[in-house]
Amino acid sequence: MPKRTDIQSVLVIGSGPIVIGQAAEFDYAGAQACLALREEGIQVILVNNNPATVMTDEACADVVYFEPLTVASVKNIIERERPDGLLATLGGQTGLNLAMKLEEAGILEAYNVELLGTPMESIKKGEDREAFRQLMHELHEPVPESEIVHSVAEAVDFANTVGYPIIVRPAYTLGGAGGGIAESEEALIRIVKGGLELSPIQQCLIEKSIAGFKEIEYEVMRDSNDTCITVCNMENIDPVGVHTGDSIVVAPSQTLTDQEYQMLRSASLKIIRTLGIVGGCNIQFALDPDSKQYYLIEVNPRVSRSSALASKATGYPIARMAAKLSLGYGLHELKNPVTEDTYASFEPSLDYVVVKFPRWPFDKLVHVNRELGTQMKATGEVMAIERNLEAGLQKAVRSLEIKTHGLSLPSLSQWEDSELWVIVKKADDRRFFAILELLRRGVTIEAIHEQTKIDRFFLTSFAKLMTLEKEIAGQSLDDITSDELSTYKKYGFSDEWLASSWGVGLADVRHTRKALGVVPSYKMVDTCAAEFEAKTPYYYSSWTGENDLLLPEKAKERVLIIGSGPIRIGQGIEFDYCSVHGAKSLRARNFEAIIINNNPETVSTDYETADRLYFEPLAVEDVLNVIEVENVDHVIVQLGGQTAIGLTKGLEEAGVSILGTTQDVIDQLEDRERFYEFMRSVEVPHIPGKTAETKEELLKAAQSIGYPILLRPSYVIGGQGMFIASNQEELAAFCEDKNHSVTFPILVDAYYPGVEFEVDVLTDGSDIFIPGMFEHVEKAGVHSGDSMAVTPPPTLEAKWKQQAINYTRQIAKGMAYKGLFNIQFVLYDEELYVIEVNPRASRTVPIFSKATSLPLITYTIDVLFGKTIAELGLSAGYRKESPYYTVKAPVFSYQKLAGLDPLLEAEMKSTGELIAISKDLPSAFRKAFAWGEEQTPALFRKKGSVFCQVDRAYDTEWQPLLRQLKEKGYSVVTEEAMSFSEWLASEDAICLVSVPAPGQKTGKQNREEALKQRVTVVSDLATFEKMIECLEVKDGEPFLLPDVVMN
């Protein structure tokens, strides 16, 4: 069917800020979809309040609204723009749920907006557990014995009939939110109660557990002609019981017989046809490895996390094709852009193995429950491509950046067998490494299979790696042969691991390996197992077979951008935005842009972003291999976050020069003693501090500086390991806490709780350009990534802005650096101090780019290649402030991470961010707080009761807020009047204000309990003050940046 001509404009709903279960994959999908629609001459109107996304660029959409993802907000946009169609299946669960509410409210019908792609009826059949189960019964497709419940009592009755364990799956939630496996009635009551509260339709599916079965996924496409294909099938190494987002996944499936593969493929095609889905769909099965009986677990009637993985694993652009199908095209009419010869109806085939490995946040969030179940906890993931499973696993582990260059976590080697078995049976994020450790100690494959139900095929691969490890340990670099080294490399052992095993330097292994002729070949991802010639410049390394890499004759300078790896707390999608724009700017300036990265969720790993893409670990060995095979002229590290910065030393030692910076400059800013020395040399005040090499020195330093103090490790992201101590007892307790590994040397800073603000700076080595300043709402001591912030600064006096500009200029002139950097200041006691200088693009660069409509990354590329600030047409100094306010607000994933205290501290906890823009500040804050349909605080919806636990140290700030709260009609409850548990059980409970004394964590249990009951928790009075100021502000009109920027 040809493209429809009656659709001229389409509203696309984005997925909003990153939360666990909904990350960068929807930026990739959304950007692809928007570009696909624009290729067809469709006007694209986008609503998405995530500023760090590529899809919110002017190049992706004709009109961009950074507005709340609520029914009221989207209704206003529809009223203003009058789109012909709405595309909601590319915005994750957020987009689907919002589309459903718009339809139920009659808004789509009232404004004659057609839901494109998958019909609403099909969405409901896939998402509504009761409708889905009924349909599967009609199709005779087996589902686990189950019951739909709307109350806890119904759940208990079902469990009493079928027995425990029971799996709970709430309807219309994200990443398994609210779900879990209940081993007892007590656990069932707790999980179902939470699940019903999280489900927008107050519905849960509870089913007899089939934990231990194989979990298999199919990614399927269908067009309106009923043509269907399977794009990719994937197998979870972890059996059913661990959320697929927390499972190690391989593609294609490794343990299915052809009969099993075809059986599940046929079922997938039958299901997508019956549901009537147009576009992409993810279908998950459980397969009994003994009886071959299968059960359908669930269907995602939208582009999903697995879609992004399948797209990168195969090269088949699922989101792009889904967008075209929504306009009426058939699969047979769309060319596959990878081959440019075959059509989209041609099923991909793979001649390699793909391994996806989750990246969890437990290295930062040490007190969180690490146990894995049906509720997702990973913040991101990595993908590795190889010719065998063993090498794929090794590559994936090395891509995680978890301080290991092999297959062991050093801490586990000290554990007793009994301790290892606990995490193997219960499954937490260390399970894979615990299994390997047990295999090292001689535990049999059969014993591990019995306890985990992981297929013996996978365990045999694990055991093979352990056998090779032992063999390598008995070798030496001097005696190694070419064949032996080739074998070790073929199975994925890194140069760094070999160097460590043989007690030699990394450069020694590299030199010997190259002398023996053991070098990687590069293979192409082509969707067709080399059956057709591919045009895509998308490569992975292997140590077997011939080289597919055919480089064009070198007519341009080649520039390598090192990406930022997996999404994690402290290093998110913002850095991918920077990498993507870096590549685009290089190509526009007649350079060949090359990207190396390993995150399957991102736009940077789309094969169309750069001239060539390498899907590799971000380690010195792998980056050097690419530099050598490409004969790279320049390397950029400042766009890839701390990951890329961390590679500078190893690259420099290998003779690679870095654009704009050196390791010496990085050390000058990251090493705190050198940093203080540098600050003194440029005559800029800094926070007083000392470096401690031992615990004794730490206690002495704290005593001499004076409490409160802030512990600050060097070379970390997201404030990892930071801690504020108000006295010696707190500091001693922190040092003794087994959950924290205090690594020395460590910096001891004085803690100044003043007004914090930050600047992003572009420098050509002489002049500076500051696009804006962000003033933080919360005082210094709350990590900048977890602070709300406003630009332009609403309370900062002109003299302090000028002082900051002067200090910035002095720092830029003194540090032999070109490009983007970030400075954080604190104003305390009428004195301005520098907290830190980050020699790279920061997480606020995309926000300033969006809020000012300035191409900051393009400017950065120009500066790196010799242009001055003046030659860019920019006025040196501080850009004129905008006549509107942009509020940046952090977004947390507390519901997914049991045990995480929502207290704002020095260590970052947020997983994403959003922006809200308005001409007046209260309206901007209102949009920031009430940013999503399900996320609007209860405080904004009704006038209930607020429970207050505020330490007396804050009486001066607290009493005026208390009066305002009462004047606005809210009731205030204290512990003297009512117990917390009694208040929480009341229908009026809407908000807990829990602010312990500085440095204290009292009230943690109450904060956690309030979160479980979906009650708003506020732990900082400055945040609460902003909430109160905008409580009675009406929802503002949709705000378009060009309206103001052009005037």
Curated annotation (Swiss-Prot):
Disulfide bonds: none annotated. Mn(2+) 1 binds at residues 284, 298. This is Carbamoyl phosphate synthase arginine-specific large chain. Mn(2+) 2 binds at residues 298, 300. Coiled coil: none annotated. Pathway: Amino-acid biosynthesis; L-arginine biosynthesis; carbamoyl phosphate from bicarbonate: step 1/1. Residues 402-549 are annotated as: Oligomerization domain. ATP 1 binds at residues 129, 169, 175-176, 208, 210, 215, 241-243, 284, 298. Its cofactor is Mg(2+); Mn(2+). It comes from Halalkalibacterium halodurans (strain ATCC BAA-125 / DSM 18197 / FERM 7344 / JCM 9153 / C-125). It is an enzyme of class 6 (ligase). One of its GO terms (molecular function) is ATP binding. InterPro entries: ATP-grasp, ATP_grasp_subdomain_1, CarbamoylP_synth_lsu, CarbamoylP_synth_lsu_oligo, CarbamoylP_synth_lsu_oligo_sf, CbamoylP_synth_lsu-like_ATP-bd, CbamoylP_synth_lsu_CPSase_dom, MGS-like_dom.
